[in-house]
Amino acid sequence: MDTSSKENIQLFCKTSVQPVGRPSFKTEYPSSEEKQPCCGELKVFLGALSFVYFAKALAEGYLKSTITQIERRFDIPSSLVGVIDGSFEIGNLLVITFVSYFGAKLHRPKIIGAGCLIMGVGTLLIAMPQFFMEQYKYEIYSPSSNSTLSISPCLLESSSQLPVSVMEKSKSKISLLAAVPFWYLPKSLPRSQSREDSNSSSEKSKFIRDDHTDYQTPQGENVKIMEMARDFLPSLKYLFGNPVYFLYLCTSTVQFNSLFGMVTYKPKYIEQQYGQSSSRANFVIGLINIPAVALGIFSGGIAMKKFRISVCGAAKLYLGSSVFGYLLFLSLFALGCENSDVAGLTVSYQGTKPVSYHERALFSDCNPRCKCSETKWEPMCGENGITYVSACPAGCQTSNRSGKNIIFYNCTCVGIAASKSGNSSGIVGRCQKDNGCPQMFLYFLVISVITSYTLSLGGIPGYILLLRCIKPQLKSFALGIYTLSIRVLAGIPAPVYFGVLIDTSCLKWGFKRCGSRGSCRLYDSNVFRHIYLGLTVILGTVSIFLSIAVLFILKKNYVSKHRNFITKRERTMVSTRFQKENCTTSDHLLQPKYWPGKETQL
């Protein structure tokens, strides 16, 4: 075969054959030979995107950690706090569907940058009430004529006002700063000329293969919004007609209902169940649980890459992590603490149990002349280990400051159920729970860390399953619908109905200055535990059954198609090998040594 023939064959092989009536398409990925901008690298994009997620996690995490502070600051019940927390997701609903659909065909980095700017402005608006509202007025003790000291709120204001405003400002600055790199990124990142086509990844783990020529922007044509909008409803119909995608969407929605409700009220649960302060509860969650979740997500990604897990394997890993995680979660029912001893609410003034709560239960024969308020909540811990609603119902006559603590003396009600020392004094604040509660709290943290790691281990396999069950050109749109469904059906309602049910366990309500009901001051620990954990387990159980259905449909619909594809591919390979052998034999027969008499003389 002469040189010109070889060149023609090579030229024919390199030339793509286009169907009749179909425009030629140009790949979005620029070649490595073309001059790329300084920021047009994958590492720059990943770094910028990681910074964006850091800013987003900082904003959402801070909002979750201030749930109890918002409840006390504005004196509102948990159900209304859930509405405020759920409204954080409402802003995404206005644009997420259209951005996910049209954004896949436009300049994605600039769209992300614009979103970061809007997020920065939003966090700045969250900080505005800190500068325009009046300072919080704490409930203070109104002393009688023979008292020597009143409780001053000055120290509390100086320690609680500053971090709120500083954190709100920091969130806004970080979100605005995160938008800068995306304005300098190109529309598409460069791709190497030779891209390995791994048989294991394309045949073992994918059942819908990427074909970039099917959905790239036509060369020389400007994309019009109306032309893209025509395929919106057909694309939406295709997504909801995909059984694996639809079932996985239902599974994730139910599972995120349990996760959103659990995470939103976890600091409150630690405060009420184990008697920890709000700052300590949030610090422990950030120090232990968040690294466990990050490690679980990273481990899931490493496992998917190292072992080259197939789609069915990813579904099994997702199901296994959910089952094992919720089995561990069941053990938390046994790791609870009993109610604190509060006079008139959980115990009588004599220290006996049980007690039936009613409005007059807060008063006793030891404090008939004190004229105490029924609505005030200013807990005081007596020397007898019983917490009193305030120093007034405890019958305290005098008070004195000892450092940062305020000590009350001559408390007649404390003396009734006094300890062996016979001391009738008390100190501001609630009494610590029994001696076994700190140990229970330690066990709770250990189980919580393991559960967080186990549940997050299935995050990446589930995400890979979501991407591989749909057409490549609909990935962005499918992710947008997925995110929209999670936010509408889980992010918004879950904190609300969790808060409504948690409010049913309240024993002592606070009241606003106008007389209306405010936030809950004291919860029934046992009822709170069963509502909080029980609702989470019920939702988790439903998601497990839906995950089993996803795995069943996946095996039924796609594994059989995958086997048929492999069978056809093997037949094609055998046929191609046979043709190559015949062609090789023909080439050998055309050599001069087989036809010595017919050798051409040049």
Curated annotation (Swiss-Prot):
Domain of life: Eukaryota
Cysteine disulfide links: 366-396, 372-392, 381-413
GO cellular component terms attached to this protein's record: basolateral plasma membrane
Pfam families given in the database record: Kazal_2, OATP
Cytoplasmic topological segments: 1-43, 104-109, 157-238, 305-308, 468-476, 555-602
Membrane protein topology class: Multi-pass membrane protein
Sites carrying sugar chains: 400, 410, 423
The UniProt record lists the keyword Cell membrane: yes
Sorted UniProt keywords: Cell membrane, Disulfide bond, Glycoprotein, Ion transport, Lipid transport, Membrane, Transmembrane, Transmembrane helix, Transport
Primary role: Mediates the Na(+)-independent high affinity transport of organic anions such as the thyroid hormones L-thyroxine (T4), L-thyroxine sulfate (T4S), and 3,3',5'-triiodo-L-thyronine (reverse T3, rT3) at the plasma membrane. Regulates T4 levels in different brain regions by transporting T4, and also by serving as an export pump for T4S, which is a source of T4 after hydrolysis by local sulfatases. Increases the access of these substrates to the intracellular sites where they are metabolized by the deiodinases.
UniProt family annotation: Belongs to the organo anion transporter (TC 2.A.60) family.
NCBIfam families: oat (TIGR00805)
Name under which the protein is recorded: Solute carrier organic anion transporter family member 1C1
Organism: Macaca fascicularis
